[in-house]
């Protein structure tokens, strides 16, 4: 029988999931091996499979997306700090090479960055759900315009009174950069204290 009472159930930083099988010792060993293999894949290649707090990403996607995923979180966190009013909509534009990536993971990174200011407990999986529960519309647009950058992400937050935007790219050195804030062109490397 599944446990119905446990002190862990009351901790805010613990997520309990149902037991979905593994009724025999052999099945439990197989599940343990599968979890160990998935953790090994993540640590060695960046691949994420069946995680509760992050969208699934293949090893191939992880190699290319790593810096972009980091950038998406920085963009969200920075624009979240710029926004004091209730958010009505989050519009995310993907341009160039980034538009061909796993946009679900990048969307989650942006929204989690924005939502963490008001709710530090959100993660990449829960943030879009929390945003929708608050009535925030999330939209994405892909375009393939050739310009100065091989690819970039632009995030626009819409409130009752105004729109604010920020854009960023990943340079050839693999480092994320902010390239535009509120329509002003810049070149700034995001720091932990900034985002």
Predicted features and spans:
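Rossmann-like dinucleotide-binding domain for NAD(H)/NADP(H)
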Residues: 1-82, 117
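A conserved regulatory-domain signal marking ACT and ACT-like small-molecule sensing domains
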Residues: 54-195
């Amino acid at each position: 029988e599944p446990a119905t009472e446990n002190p862990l159930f009351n901790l805010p930083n613990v997520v309990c999931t149902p037991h979905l099988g593994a009724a025999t010792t052999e099945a439990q060993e197989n599940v343990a091996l599968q979890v160990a293999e998935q953790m090994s894949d993540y640590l060695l290649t960046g691949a994420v499979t069946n995680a509760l707090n992050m969208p699934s990403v293949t090893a191939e996607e992880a190699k290319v997306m790593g810096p972009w995923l980091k950038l998406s979180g920085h963009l969200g966190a920075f624009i979240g700090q710029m926004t004091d009013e209730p958010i009505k909509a989050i519009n995310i534009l993907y341009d160039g090479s980034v538009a061909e990536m796993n946009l679900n993971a990048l969307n989650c990174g942006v929204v989690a960055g924005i939502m963490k200011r008001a709710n530090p407990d959100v993660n990449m999986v829960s943030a879009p759900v929390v945003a929708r529960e608050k009535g925030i519309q999330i939209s994405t647009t892909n375009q393939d315009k050739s310009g100065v950058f091989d690819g970039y992400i632009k995030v626009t937050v819409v409130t009752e009174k105004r729109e604010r935007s920020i854009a960023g790219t990943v340079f050839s050195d693999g480092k994320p950069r902010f390239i535009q804030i509120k329509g002003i062109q810049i070149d700034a490397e995001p720091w932990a204290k900034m985002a």
